[in-house]
Amino acid sequence: MDSRTGELLTYTQCQTGCYFDDIKNPIYFRLQNTTTMATGNKIITLQIRANHNLRKVLGLQICWLNLVVLSVSPRLSGEALLDRFKFHVMKHLNNLGVISINNVIRSINHFIDLFDQRVFYAPSFYYNIKMRLY
């Protein structure tokens, strides 16, 4: 859904993409927040942002995808999870060959499916996508 207008994204808007090799550093990853709970579990918030060149090709004004991860492992830090997450998402996008909104979401789901649910659990995924209106 477009967070500015409230309209649902169309199929063509979600499937529009560009080749992975055409854009240098198409997406970048940020560690938003790491919170340690009293039980030893960690809540880690990761953010994926589209680069300016990718946003221009896809016709986006803003594209932020946020993933909240609940880690049961006391050894898994936010930086370690961010490195693994970045590696696997970029590897999956490289294997697909095309970057689109749907392919990025598929890559995130692929990463979540790769790891055992006992290590971490992703309870929420939210986004901020705004299409260019002009």
UniProtKB/Swiss-Prot annotation:
- UniProt-listed GO biological process terms: viral process
* InterPro entries recorded: Gemini_AL3
Q: Which domain of life is it from?
A: Viruses
Any Pfam family matching the protein: Gemini_AL3
Q: Is 4Fe-4S given among the entry's keywords? A: no
Q: Which UniProt keywords apply?
A: Host-virus interaction
The set of disulfide-linked cysteines is: none
Q: What does this protein do?
A: Increases viral DNA accumulation. Enhances infectivity and symptom expression.
Subunit description? Homooligomer. Interacts with the replication-associated protein (REP). Interacts with host proliferating cell nuclear antigen (PCNA). Interacts with host retinoblastoma-related protein 1 (RBR1), and may thereby deregulate the host cell cycle. Oligomerization and interaction with PCNA are necessary for optimal replication enhancement.
Q: Which family does it belong to?
A: Belongs to the geminiviridae replication enhancer protein family.
Name of the protein in its database record: Replication enhancer protein
What is the species of this protein? Tomato pseudo-curly top virus
